Regions:
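Catalytic domains that recognize anionic headgroups
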Residues: 235
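Transmembrane and membrane-interface helices of multi-pass
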Residues: 2-229
Length: 235
């Protein structure tokens, strides 16, 4: 099942990206003002998994659709390379932008990235008034390095040869359909009545650790009120 293997590979790669971003967020924003222990790093990654899985489900959809088509149609390697590189580039740039913005702005705003950031798109000067040119250059450099690093990693896992059409195409399609259902459940947040939401990862009375598990790519489209919920008020 070559197609299923590539799907699992992309899912795990993107999931690891979101999980790995959390220790970096803690490292940058921790310190005397926001103390934490090694056990807190593990807890943050663990409690953040539901939103990481949901966000990964969204991010893996372009790969999923291509692999579903590839079961029935033999796609030329050139087409695969172009498609993967376009998707990889978009994901690398967008995720780098979200991760760097979330990490940097938290030190100023004291809450995770959410819809508030869109208030500054048309008036960026207001957000940069207290930022020195050197600091701004450092942020731009961090974004460029992060985007480049993500792209290099993602590009290493693109198909290096033409994906063969599956011999048992109907069975393979049914299996991929099942995987699509699992992706939907991950995006939804499980089989319960409540769907995935920012508050589902809150676990601590310590505000910094309370916010740290939130996936900024998931919380970005949410309203400011949802992104600044108080501890244990997610029910």
């Amino acid at each position: 099942m070559t197609h299923l293997r590539y799907l699992a590979q992309q899912f795990l790669l993107l999931l690891l990206t979101f999980v790995a971003a959390k220790p970096l967020f803690l490292l940058f924003n921790g310190g005397a003002a926001h103390p934490y222990a090694f056990g807190d790093v593990i807890s943050v990654m663990w409690h953040g998994l539901p939103l990481d899985v949901a966000t990964t489900g969204y991010a893996v959809i372009p790969y999923y659709l291509l692999l579903c088509i590839g079961i029935w149609v033999k796609l030329p390697l050139k087409c695969l390379n172009i498609y993967y590189r376009v998707v990889n580039t978009l994901l690398a740039v967008l995720l780098a932008l979200v991760f760097v913005a979330d990490t940097v702005l938290y030190s100023v705003w004291e809450f995770k990235l959410d819809g508030t950031v869109f208030n500054y798109i048309c008036q960026p000067g207001g957000a940069l008034q207290s930022v020195s040119p050197l600091y701004a250059a450092g942020v731009v450099a961090a974004f460029a390095i992060t985007a480049a690093a993500l792209w290099v990693v993602y590009d290493r896992f693109r198909p290096k040869k033409t994906l063969p059409r599956e011999r048992r195409r109907v069975a393979s399609s049914l299996l991929m359909l099942l995987c699509g259902g699992l992706l939907f459940l991950g995006i939804r947040g499980g089989v319960g009545r409540s769907t995935a939401k920012v508050g589902m990862v809150y676990y601590s009375t310590h505000q910094f650790l309370h916010h740290a598990p939130v996936n900024p790519a998931f919380s970005l489209p949410t309203t400011p009120s949802a992104g600044q919920a108080h501890p244990f008020d997610s029910d």
